[in-house]
Amino acid sequence: MNNSLSPKAIRELREETCNPLGAPQVTTDLSENIIMTSLDDLHNWARLSSLWPLLYGTACCFIEFAALIGSRFDFDRFGLVPRSSPRQADLLIVAGTVTMKMAPALVRLYEQMPEPKYVIAMGACTITGGMFSADSTTAVRGVDKLIPVDLYLPGCPPRPEAIFDAVIKLRKKVANESILERNKSEQTHRYLTVDHEMNLVFSENTGEYLNKKSEKSIESSKLNPVEESSENIYETNSIDEVIK
């Protein structure tokens, strides 16, 4: 009897006796059942969809960012949830003028943020000092002298649409990062420092120009003798008239 059964029948009989429930059926379209990705892509996708900003507003630029909270722009659709604690935030948005007294507080907030963290410099006063960079002794000429900046957003002030564009560009940067490369590029210094090669240069200014006469003094010295001679001639003529 066993010799009359085909190999296929024997296989089916064995499956029925060994596994009465039957083997699970796998569909031919594997793309609907299997997701293939890398750890970097999965990690970046989770982070770019939930950027929690810490809002550091010191001047008028922050008013434009406050407009994003309303229903007209609704920045919640990007996953932005404002936080009041730096330990719960991964994005620092600096908007407004940064003074010398506020610089240590800003650096402390940045240090308390967990890795990975990002910084957006919003407005001209934050990037370069703005109108206070000319004659102010208390304004910081650029927040990148204190903390590393990932994205610069110029404007005085920037519009809410420009802030959305900056967030989208930052999301693209987050999506292309690697965990290993991010660990290599972590900041090791308290402040953002740059190595400079100082060369000794002697000044060409010897101070001789202070002893030189100006062009006005030279011209006045040339004109004075003529005036004196004309006055002498007038005096001699008047004396002659009196004698006559």
Swiss-Prot record:
Gene3D superfamilies in alphabetical order: 3.40.50.12280
InterPro entries given in the database record: NADH_UbQ_OxRdtase-like_20kDa, NADH_UQ_OxRdtase_20Kd_su
Catalytic activity: a plastoquinone + NADH + (n+1) H(+)(in) = a plastoquinol + NAD(+) + n H(+)(out); a plastoquinone + NADPH + (n+1) H(+)(in) = a plastoquinol + NADP(+) + n H(+)(out)
Ranges where the record places region Disordered: 213-244
GO cellular component, one term: respiratory chain complex I
Quaternary structure annotation from Swiss-Prot or TrEMBL: NDH-1 can be composed of about 15 different subunits; different subcomplexes with different compositions have been identified which probably have different functions.
Protein name: NAD(P)H-quinone oxidoreductase subunit K
Organism this protein belongs to: Prochlorococcus marinus subsp. pastoris (strain CCMP1986 / NIES-2087 / MED4)
